[in-house]
Swiss-Prot record:
It comes from Mycobacterium phage L5 (Mycobacteriophage L5). InterPro entries: GlrX_YruB (IPR011911), Glutaredoxin (IPR002109), Grx-like_ET (IPR051548), Thioredoxin-like_sf (IPR036249). GO terms for molecular function: electron transfer activity. Residues 9-103 form the Glutaredoxin domain. Pfam families: Glutaredoxin. It comes from the Viruses. Gene3D superfamilies: Glutaredoxin (3.40.30.10). NCBIfam families: GlrX_YruB. This is Gene 56 protein.
Length: 103
């Protein structure tokens, strides 16, 4: 269980229904925790995927996105955010919070 909003799914994923954001992460990653904390504080639902426990996720992050480290934040609406990028995260949060309020 990650907070009270997430369902632990097979130890490698933390999933919600219809989450608009996926955060690729690994255990012990402080920047990953900051990303997840920032999204949680903003009320943004997300899936957290542990790349050390999911080889398909690892391949996607390293081979498709060409990311060398995590966190990696992926959505259907924005280009991937590689690493902890507070300004890009704020833009993403603004987009999703505005779309939820209809603005």
């Amino acid at each position: 269980m990650y907070g009270d909003r997430y369902i632990d799914w097979d130890g490698a994923h933390v999933r919600t229904l219809f989450a608009p954001v996926t955060v690729y992460t690994r255990p012990g990653c402080k920047p990953c925790e900051r990303v997840k904390d920032k999204l949680t504080a903003a009320g943004i639902d997300f899936d957290a995927v542990d790349v050390t426990a999911n080889s398909e996720a690892y391949d996607y992050v390293t081979k498709v996105l060409n990311a060398m480290s995590v966190p990696v934040v992926v959505t259907d609406t924005h280009k991937p955010i590689l690493g902890y990028q507070p300004d890009q995260l704020d833009e993403l949060i603004d987009y999703y919070t505005a779309s939820e309020t209809g603005l």
